[in-house]
């Protein structure tokens, strides 16, 4: 179109001029049609000036230059005596850009692409560019299977040579795959091969990855999957000859035909390593584990190359090249692998930098580094630094980049780029809890206090059954070696009867301190001391409670519901943590084991020990870690020492949002059995002096397990994927009392055997976790499908400040 205008303009110029072959001298230049563009700007675009002698070639160059400026959609050059007359039609200015009908592509993404093409508000409208954008967008829709899609640019003229630009989308529906055919396969059936594809012509209900909607990119991925399937099974000559994609007349169906040549199976004849091995030949050769006689395997070859690169990377060779050339012998069906290694230069680290840590101090991040500045680069040490930063839980994302230093042959900078998340919360207000009723809460919790890495918490709770306050602080680097120091003080006024537990009131306060000793990258040992004072009152005569009092030599009365006593205990606290999770919040891979215990020491009124073990394992089932299987367990056991029992207020409980969802908090397990008698108003019907109830008392042993399937959250933008998590789960748990005596009198009163651990409760449901500005929120809906008499269901539950 532009060349056509050039030709017309040149013809007009030639027909309107009378001069010799040598041209003429320009005495003046006049413009017609300028509106937005200044005369000076137009003159600067022209190669011709007043006083120049011009000919046909000069005029042609002038026309080209004016078109190239991007300001004009039509240019004509005429001669009027010694004056050059330039007639132009300016391109209109874009006043606004809007979109309509786009669902698959967001407005922000469209604006970015338009701006990259020079289409933005205030700029001139280039209709050729606009046409290219229309075609490009339609091509995009075709690539994702929407063949009926159309994109039209609607240009509405406005005064002063301005226009409104509106892109109107008609996306249509995605074409679905009707059938996938593979032609030429003999060793494997078509069904077996297609079962590895993402694109499917039939998707079973249980397949959460398969998709019938055609996408060109997914097809390319499936072709690579097909190629790898054959190469991993010895078919070294396998080839995909062609691929045909056919569209049904209504553009709603797709037929895919893949033509392949399988070839024969080949075995390894040997592996030969050559090149610049940087003195690590023995280690490199140990990585070439493919033995003569085994089937050729493409994945093993790739893994071997990656292992060699990682090995060299640990020694500072940041950019090694490893290429494997297969020498195929068709006569004896063997493949000899020639591995050529070029280690390249050895690099050392000039600087380690951090970007994005607006709150966290550099020192907090730098102390997690295992790679040192000025030392040889170690890729494994760099990766450990990334892993440790992720496990801190301060960041949504952590990326690392090794950048070569300009002008230096052997220096690199290591740059860690982090995106900080909200690590604290301030909360003051009134809420409603599923277990606590109306709740008044105030608290400040900051896991990265002022960017120092300190964890500081001030919390208080007031509800129907509890008044609680606590101050805690932890310094994760009390020493430069990573020994941590933490401590807390607390006060708790707990009315168990109002919490649907057995009847007693406990006012307690205490203090404890703990040192943590890192053993290696993943293991930490903890040791500490604690003190707690318990003041119990309003104790109704209950069998398990009175059994404990008897073990202390307390003469509690079974005819009174106003018994009480106090105890002061000093404890030795210990623990061990193994943490190999990929990050500190919302992990997607790895495992964590946490062992905690305490035992009373001389000077205590009680003598007991208590141990808990928590485990969690995350197993991703896709490369992007969006689909994850989570297995969790919690075990607990405690007992008395020296003939005494563990205090009943130290019992384990289960049920609620953090253990077995779908059951009321702390409701699973043994229930209170009260003594009945004159003056006691604790039961309606007593048998043999005992009265059973639905009040939970907990037990000295507990086992809880959970299987969870974490999925992408439906209808949620990728932008929020790191702050919201959805999962389907199944929970199971049991609490029991190993010291319970299932006597004949108990059986006659209809009391279950609370020493039996097989009374397992089970539930299943769905959960949503959200890292909100107020802190982590957890919502769950669960349906119990195995419960016992006295259990209380609670399908919908929520919790603040708990993640797993």
From Swiss-Prot:
Instruction: Return the InterPro entries for the record.
Output: Bac_surfAg_D15, BamA/TamA_POTRA, D15-like, OM_assembly_BamA, POTRA
Q: What are the subcellular locations of this protein?
A: Cell outer membrane
Give the keywords, sorted: Cell outer membrane, Membrane, Repeat, Signal, Transmembrane, Transmembrane beta strand
Going by the entry's taxonomy, the superkingdom of the source organism is recorded as Bacteria
As given in the record, the signal peptide range reads: 1-20
Q: Where is the POTRA domain?
A: 24-91, 92-172, 175-263, 266-344, 347-421
**Gene3D superfamilies in alphabetical order:** membrane protein fhac, membrane protein fhac: a member of the omp85/tpsb transporter family
GO terms under biological process: Gram-negative-bacterium-type cell outer membrane assembly; protein insertion into membrane
Q: Name one GO cellular component term.
A: Bam protein complex
Identify its protein family: Belongs to the BamA family.
What does the annotation say about its assembly with partners?
Answer: Part of the Bam complex, which is composed of the outer membrane protein BamA, and four lipoproteins BamB, BamC, BamD and BamE.
Function field: Part of the outer membrane protein assembly complex, which is involved in assembly and insertion of beta-barrel proteins into the outer membrane. Constitutes, with BamD, the core component of the assembly machinery.
What the entry lists under HAMAP family is as follows: OM_assembly_BamA
Its recorded name reads Outer membrane protein assembly factor BamA
> From which organism does this entry originate?
Cronobacter sakazakii (strain ATCC BAA-894)
| Gene behind this protein | bamA
């Amino acid at each position: 179109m532009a060349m056509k205008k050039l030709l017309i303009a040149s013809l007009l110029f030639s027909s309107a001029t009378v001069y010799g072959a040598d041209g003429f001298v320009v005495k003046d230049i006049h413009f017609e049609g300028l509106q937005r563009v200044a005369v000076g700007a137009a003159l600067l675009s022209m190669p011709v000036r007043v006083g120049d002698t011009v000919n046909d070639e000069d005029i042609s160059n002038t026309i080209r230059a004016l078109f190239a400026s991007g300001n004009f959609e039509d240019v004509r050059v005429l001669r009027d005596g010694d004056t050059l007359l330039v007639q132009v039609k300016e391109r209109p200015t874009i006043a606004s850009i809007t979109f309509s009908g786009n669902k698959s592509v967001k407005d922000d993404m469209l604006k970015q692409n338009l701006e990259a093409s020079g289409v933005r508000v205030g700029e001139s409208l280039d209709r050729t560019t606009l046409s290219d954008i229309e075609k490009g967008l339609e091509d995009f829709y075709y690539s994702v299977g929407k063949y009926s899609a159309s994109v039209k640019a609607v240009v509405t003229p406005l005064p002063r040579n301005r226009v409104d630009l509106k892109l109107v989308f008609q996306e249509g529906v995605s074409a679905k795959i009707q059938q996938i055919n593979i032609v030429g396969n003999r060793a494997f059936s078509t069904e077996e091969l297609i079962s590895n594809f993402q694109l499917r012509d039939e998707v079973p209900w249980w397949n959460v990855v398969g998709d019938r909607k055609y996408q060109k990119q997914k097809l390319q991925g499936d072709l690579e999957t097909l190629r790898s399937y054959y190469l991993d099974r010895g078919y070294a000559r396998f080839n995909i000859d062609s691929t045909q994609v056919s569209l049904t007349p209504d553009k709603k169906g797709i037929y895919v035909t893949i033509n392949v040549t399988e070839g024969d199976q080949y075995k390894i004849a040997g592996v030969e390593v050559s090149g610049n091995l940087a003195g690590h030949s023995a280690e490199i050769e140990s990585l070439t584990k493919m033995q003569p006689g085994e089937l050729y395997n493409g994945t093993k070859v790739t893994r071997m190359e990656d292992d060699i690169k990682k090995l060299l990377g640990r020694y500072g060779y940041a950019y090694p090249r490893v290429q494997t050339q297969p020498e195929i012998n068709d006569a004896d069906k063997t493949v000899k692998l020639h591995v050529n290694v070029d280690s390249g230069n050895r690099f050392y680290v000039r600087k380690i930098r951090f970007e994005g840590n607006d709150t966290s101090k550099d020192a907090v991040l730098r102390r997690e580094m295992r790679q040192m500045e000025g030392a040889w680069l170690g890729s494994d040490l760099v990766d450990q630094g990334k892993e440790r930063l992720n496990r801190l839980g301060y960041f949504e994302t952590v990326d690392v980049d090794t950048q070569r230093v300009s002008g230096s042959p052997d220096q690199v900078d290591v740059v860690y780029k982090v995106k900080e998340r909200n690590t604290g919360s301030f909360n003051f207000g009134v809420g409603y809890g599923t277990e606590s009723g109306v709740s008044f809460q105030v608290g400040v919790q900051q896991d990265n206090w002022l960017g120092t890495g300190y964890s500081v918490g001030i919390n208080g709770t007031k509800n129907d059954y509890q008044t609680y306050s606590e101050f805690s602080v932890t310094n994760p680097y009390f020493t430069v070696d990573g020994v941590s120091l933490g401590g807390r003080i607390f006060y708790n006024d707990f009315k168990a009867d109002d919490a649907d537990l057995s009847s007693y009131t406990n006012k307690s306060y205490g203090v404890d301190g703990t040192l943590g000793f890192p053993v290696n990258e993943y293991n930490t040992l903890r040791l500490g001391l604690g003190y707690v004072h318990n003041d119990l009152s309003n104790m109704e005569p209950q069998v398990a409670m009175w059994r404990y009092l008897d073990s202390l030599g307390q003469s509690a009365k079974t005819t009174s519901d106003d018994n009480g006593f106090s105890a002061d205990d000093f404890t030795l606290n210990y623990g061990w943590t193994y943490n190999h999770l990929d990050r500190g919040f919302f992990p997607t891979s790895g495992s964590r084991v946490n062992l905690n215990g305490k035992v009373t020491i001389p000077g205590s009124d009680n003598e007991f020990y208590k141990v808990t073990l928590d485990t969690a394992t995350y197993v991703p089932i896709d490369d992007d870690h969006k689909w994850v299987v989570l297995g969790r367990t919690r075990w607990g056991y405690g007992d008395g020492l020296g003939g005494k029992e563990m205090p009943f207020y130290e019992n384990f409980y289960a049920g609620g949002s953090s253990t077995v969802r779908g059951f009321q908090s702390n409701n699973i397990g043994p229930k209170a059995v009260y003594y009945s008698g004159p003056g006691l108003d604790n039961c309606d019907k007593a048998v043999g002096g005992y009265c059973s109830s639905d009040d939970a008392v907990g037990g000295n042993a507990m086992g809880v397990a959970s299987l969870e399937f974490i999925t992408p959250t439906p209808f949620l933008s990728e932008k929020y994927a790191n702050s919201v998590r959805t999962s389907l789960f199944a929970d199971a748990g049991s609490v029991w009392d190993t010291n319970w005596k299932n006597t004949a009198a108990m059986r006659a009163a209809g009391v279950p055997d609370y020493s039996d651990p097989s009374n397992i409760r089970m539930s299943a449901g769905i959960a949503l976790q959200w890292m909100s500005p107020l802190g982590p929120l957890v919502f769950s809906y669960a349906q119990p499908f195995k419960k016992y008499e006295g259990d209380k269901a609670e399908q919908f539950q929520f919790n603040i400040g708990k993640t797993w």
